[in-house]
Amino acid sequence: MKDLFKLLKAQAKTEEFDAIKIALASPDMIRSWSFGEVKKPETINYRTFKPERDGLFCARIFGPVKDYECLCGKYKRLKHRGVICEKCGVEVTQTKVRRERMGHIELASPTAHIWFLKSLPSRIGLLLDMPLRDIERVLYFESYVVVEGGMTYLERNQILTEEQYLDALEEFGDEFDAKMGAEAIHHLLKNMDLEQECEQLREEIVDVSSETKRKKLTKRIKLLESFVHSGNKPEWMILNVLPVLPPDLRPLVPLDGGRFATSDLNDLYRRVINRNNRLKRLLDLSAPDIIVRNEKRMLQEAVDALLDNGRRGRVITSSNKRPLKSLADMIKGKQGRFRQNLLGKRVDYSGRSVITVGPYLRLHQCGLPKKMALELFKPFIYGKLEICGLATTIKAAKKMVEREEAVVWDVLDEVIREHPVMLNRAPTLHRLGIQAFEPVLVEGKAIQLHPLVCAAYNADFDGDQMAVHIPLTLEAQLEARALMMSTNNILSPANGEPIIVPSQDVVLGLYYMTRDRVNSKGEGMILTGPKEAEKIYHAGIAELHARVKVRITEYEKIDDNELVEKKQIIDTTIGRAILWMIVPKGLPFDLVNQVLGKKSISKMLNTCYRILGLKPTVIFADQIMYTGFAYAARSGSSVGIDDMVIPAHKAEIIDDAENEVAEIQEQFQSGLVTAGERYNKVIDIWAAANERVAKAMMDNLSTEVVLNCHGKEELQVSFNNIFMMSDSGARGSAAQIRQLAGMRGLMAKPDGSIIETPITANFREGLNVLQYFISTHGARKGLADTALKTANSGYLTRRLVDVAQDLVVTEEDCGTLSGIVMTPVIEGGDVKESLRERVLGRVTTENILQPGKTDILVKRNTLLNEQWCDILEEHSVDNIKVRSVVTCDADFGVCAYCYGRDLARGHLVNKGEAIGVIAAQSIGEPGTQLTMRTFHIGGAAFRAAAESSIQVKNHGILCLVNAKFVINSANKIVITSRNAELKISDEFGRTKESYKVPYGAIMAKGDGANIISGETIANWDPHTMPVITEVNGFIRFTDMIEGQTIIRQTDELTGLSSIVILDTAERTSSGKDLRPALKIVDANQQDILIPGTDMPAQYFLPGKTIVQLEDGTKITSGDTLARLPQETSGTKDITGGLPRVADLFEARIPKEPAILAEASGIISFGKDTKGKRRLVISSLHSNDSYEEMIPKWRQLNVFEGERVERGDVISDGPESPHDILRLRGVHAVTRYIINEVQDVYRLQGVRINDKHIEVIVRQMLRKATIINAGGSDLLEGEQVEYSRIKIINRQLKSEGRQEITYVRDLLGITKASLATESFISAASFQETTRVLTEASVAGKRDDLRGLKENVIVGRLIPAGTGYAYHQERARYSKHREEALDMQQITAADEASANLAELLNSSLTNHKH
């Protein structure tokens, strides 16, 4: 038995935990935490500063004020540890127990916990099924509630006013029982039979037809069940005992001058205790009811204020009108416990200083000021001094360091050798905001930073500051070196391109070095190699730009890392030959033999990394930087005012424009054009003029004519300094040069509209006062925008991180066969993103076959690297199905194959990689570069004329997709389908262009025809929508009665008459129910059927349609029967930039969204109501029909009798992602969100890999709603984690029971974060009170799966290097459980054996 007891004791002590559970505390539990009751509101004696007995700081309850010393001083020192002083009753122990010992207050009357009352939806209200208003009236003593109805007609939970109560008392006497206040509610909650109530509701819900009622019942069932399962009792939501926080967590600090600084909680507790004591006294005196009631109400209010001040009634303020901070305020918000102390902690061993350039550093180094290093590495120095025997004690070592003796510096050098430090620049928007470097000691007080890492930090040297952190433990140093060293972060995790890219001076230096100049000194020489080139350059025999022939030795890398040498004489320049000396072996000479701008340098580094790997790339990057700086200095580039050459034609262009404007002004005054047209035309004219000036200026700047060595004129690229800076990509853009030397052009007002008088001057000429004033308009808006943008972008990043934080790569391969189909992104005539860019680094889902053959080109589950992409391009594969995070089958996290390549490392992603956080950072980090504004269409900034034709840009073959068409009498193709697309593909079948073709477009060529570039192949009238017949025959009017449904109009100019259908609103009452239509009949007046269906060919005409044919006219298929004028959509604002990205990720439903067909079938219209028309879709295969009411002002894309597929657009508008998910499925919504988000980023030139957006989409699709619960105990209409449904379904399938059917839900990122399984993560994000209330009622358990929860409980995160630790812990705990089970079994066996022995022996003793 002893062993068993030992075992139990050992188990109670363990600190290891795998999950955290939150639940309601019962009164007994609160008493068990407590070390005594707080009876008095006093805190400490103001003279002696000793805590008062039984007060809020009482030493007897909470522990001693000084370590191992009782209050009266009878027991001091360690030897009396654990003694309780008989005089003052204080236990002799450490002071720190005052941080953990709690007290309690016995409340004289029960009080409702405000969180469960007022946090919506009110838990108490839902449980009792009473409105919150009524419960509040009971709690705050305004009305009675019946607790026992007895034999009367009064029911339980019925509310009675004072008068009704008195009447009932007269009538029934004491047959019934009604109470008020929290006691009443407590009584009701206590007497609830949860399980019976649950059964009853489950029976009720089956017969309920109304949606709202069912939702309400489902909510109640869920709440009741959560109480049953969690073991919480409903009456615990009413407090009888109030716990008191340990005093050291609500300190009271004496200030000088006899005042005290105190925590607000003390004030709040004091009010509660005062009111409680007063209430006790009143109850003892048996005071009149009304007084007691008032006191109880005051107590309730005091407890409310303590728990959550300001939740109900007015906020309780302190003496200086500041609201008191209650317990709820302590944990919520940015300054609350979660975000301030648990997720963001201050760290020791850190420093910060201004940064300056360290152009001589290596990529893995940073310059650390000596003063700083001495302070930061102090403990290491002390240790080293002691080990070396230079100091005898730590104290001596301290003295030596303070005196800064010479030997200390030597020791410091040794200590910092190969000890990496971490540099961080705020704001840390992505993981490259913290990198590790080896410190190099420098004089001065500024940290020196390597110029190439500035791009990753987004740092510049205009006064930026950076922080230094020291990794202390060996493991930390190891991680810093192996994972965070700047040399390991060459590629950006957002797009897999190099982020260590030279910029500014370096680019200018390399550009200058690789340019060629006609007729420069030394031209035409033939040199033996780069060494000689350098020699003659330094000797001044040849110039840097001289065109020469050089013998170049190239090395080509063959598969098994062998280098093959190849020598040849190449035409190049001296500069390029010199640059070739630093290029590592294995790269081709063409990389250098060109004019190097920023893009080509980036490409060169990328190639180097892919061919040669990490180490040569790092060395190469450093060399590029040194060389670039050296030659930028040599070039002597600087900007002078004469570099800004103003084009000669400028004045003439501006005069022309002014004349045109004057002409339009005249037309406007004589009333030929409207004000709007005049404004638009003026802006068009000026925009065109600006373009012409800019073109003239650039032509002038960019080239110059020079004489070559043969005395002939030759055009060469200019050596103008400003042009060189812009052309190389070092600084400045064409738009900025235009403002310096062209004209500033049109300016926008802060509201986005364009001022019609442009600034014709440029900065070189100088602006006059008016021009300057107009300039400031836009500039100020720019600054205001930037400030707003930063905050918004940061908030978006925070929401993204929160939704994706728990997504980690957890397995190698989930074995799924599904994936998403990737095609190149083509908009109109441009390939915006090639297939290669989209599939690089993804894993194939299925075997890819050679186009047109059955040979396998790429096997399934192949990671597509650069070589595979080359093969795919050779064979011109046009679409590929690749694995995606969205379709990954892993239950928790995702698998490596579905994610593909780790972009920052260039190989398949490792297990434990925190891909969620990386995705969130990659999307959020460029957020500050996006615009904030909403574009107004209007003005030259953004105006597209209504499209009316398609003109192709490339040669190729025409291909129609989803197109239905008829051939008209002129033998042209007329499109009759709604979502036809037209693609132009080259001879290999690769799509080059793609366009949408509207209904009624006339095509010049058919499917499969050859097209030459510049040809117009389709045109249509953008202002009307035609009605096109698909059959031949004669027209017959039906229900077209003049004056009732139609009127005739005659055009004044042409004299042609036409029939116009009246809108239903304009018709007389007799014409309201008539439905005008055109029927197509044959010569015998018999109906003609639409080909392929059994529907007669008749076309119902909506209001405002214009018909130009007469009754009985002969028509042929493809003719236009009628035209419906389309209002061109007014100037709708295009939401762009950051707000658009936020809208997409929040899955917001747009205003006036597109209406999509809910089912496939034939369209017809039912009976209209006042403002809406009834659209009916009848299924082709069954008798089902689907009805929908659509507002009349919505313009429909479909005619009666037309066939639609589920998910087709019926009325145009922005599509709602929820509709896309419901009608077209997960793949479609993924594609939609990816494309829309990418459009915004592409506009700003930011590249982000699709993977990252897919990761966020996966998290948005985490939940599903249950349609049929099958064999599980879930409820219909309940929203459940999708992974949970998958697991339950697998289980049900194996047991042969019915599986759950469900639909996937799309949640916005904020909602998804709050709906996560982990309540700790949700509570630390937003709405802390609501999340915690919900979690505690349900008795939720947090399994600590995500990263955030583990940071909060102070563990290593289950990602990266912590992943292995968590795997190991899981294995260990499983092992331990098994061992414990075994031990318990053996111990029990032993105990029973011993017992048997005992009994036997006692029996034998008796016998004797």
From Swiss-Prot:
GO terms for biological process: DNA-templated transcription. Its EC number is 2.7.7.6. It comes from the Bacteria. GO terms for cellular component: DNA-directed RNA polymerase complex. Gene3D superfamilies: 1.10.132.30, 1.10.150.390, 1.10.1790.20, 1.10.40.90, 2.40.40.20, 2.40.50.100, RNA polymerase II, clamp domain, RNA polymerase Rpb1, domain 3. Mg(2+) binds at D460, D462, D464. Zn(2+) 1 binds at C70, C72, C85, C88. DNA-dependent RNA polymerase catalyzes the transcription of DNA into RNA using the four ribonucleoside triphosphates as substrates. NCBIfam families: rpoC_TIGR. This is DNA-directed RNA polymerase subunit beta'. The lineage of its organism: Bacteria, Pseudomonadati, Pseudomonadota, Gammaproteobacteria, Candidatus Palibaumannia. The gene is rpoC.
